[in-house]
Amino acid sequence: MRSTLACIAVFVGLCPSITSSQDANDRAHHIQNNVLGIDGHNDTVQRVVYENVDLGNRLSDGMIDIPRLHAGGVHVPFFALWVPTYYKGSEAVRRTLDLRDAMQRVLDKHPDQIELATSARDIERIVGQSKIAAVLTVEGGHQIANDLAVLRMYRRMGILSMTLTHFRSNDWADSSTGKPEHNGLTDFGKQVVHEMNSIGMIVDISHVSDKTFYDVLQVTSKPVIASHSSCRSMSDVPRNMTDDMLRALARNGGVVGVNFAASFLNQQDAEELKRKVSNENALEPNLAGTELDQFAAKEYFEDKGEFKVGHATVEDAAKCIDHIVKIAGIEHVGIGSDFDGITLVPHDLEDVSKIPNLTVALLNRGYSEDDIKKIMGENFLRVIREVVGN
């Protein structure tokens, strides 16, 4: 009898924490269902191209599909049209068009589930219809082939943002992970920024070198974003932002989307970024057309085979958000998962359906529902409205 009573006492003692945990989960799902959730960066279009997946179905692997976007409360994913930096000139443009076509096939196949958004008003209308509002971006300035006409063409195709560099420096801007060639932004690079401001295209400074970042802020007349970067104070990798950079971005009115790559969130995982960078930057295939695409496909599947869970956890992502809020302010942080572009993910944040786990972590840190709405989407929406327009 005494042992039975003792067990009952232990169970009763546990009940408040069990109930509290369930309450937090329920509240998190409620918030995610009612927030206008924006994820500032994913690489899911690669899966459409290389694996011919149907994003309308819940997939058995990968990190994003339409059902899991709804489950995670992410209604506005930024789909990156990313072309590896070993594609040069017209080949990079051709491949960008291939990716744009692949995304169009998704939109055409599921018009009742997903629609292209090209303005803030589009986003609000589409989400109001319980559909996914797809925002398209270009991830790498090499994809304009040093031609402002190509940049303008991308904008007319509904692309709202461009990352100025990727892993390598290009002809007009230095990358954070490439050999510095220009001491930041060249005169043509400054023209690119001016043109993006003029045509209503968001400047994305993820991937750029520190010097390029500060050069951009000297040139731009509009807020910029770091679509998928995190805190260098947590993981000392060049892709992350220093506290001074965070303050400067806040003064600009911009937003940093916290990257969920484990290597960006926990120093123990930092070697993974070095692996990815060294692998791509070492590649110089002397190929073109179909042969180059086949080479890229081989690299894609080899990289996908490296997928695993790292030392980082969802708590590290919350800690990074917390740090940015303290340094830059609540108005200047969002999420930029990099899902389907990362191979080392945090515990409890393995795909987009797990975003409510991050909401729970933020609630446990004392963030209000209004705070979380800003972090989960309103801050990015503000920049879209200010740069792209209604």
What are these regions (language model features)?
Residues 1-4:
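Positively charged n-region of N-terminal signal peptides that target proteins for export
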Residues 6-16:
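Bacterial N-terminal signal peptides
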Residues 18-183, 232, 236-390:
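N-terminal hydrophobic targeting/anchoring segments and the immediately downstream early-domain regions
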Residues 51, 147-151, 212-222:
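Distinct, well-ordered alpha-helical segments
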Residues 181-188, 204-209, 241:
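Short, contiguous, pocket-lining structural segments
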Residues 182-198, 216-226, 358-361:
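Alpha-helix-loop-beta-strand connector modules within alpha/beta enzyme cores
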Residues 194-205, 209-215, 243-251:
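Substrate-binding cleft of carbohydrate-active enzyme catalytic domains
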Residues 218-228, 232-234, 239-240:
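His/Asp/Glu-rich metal/cofactor-coordinating catalytic motifs and the adjacent surface-exposed loops
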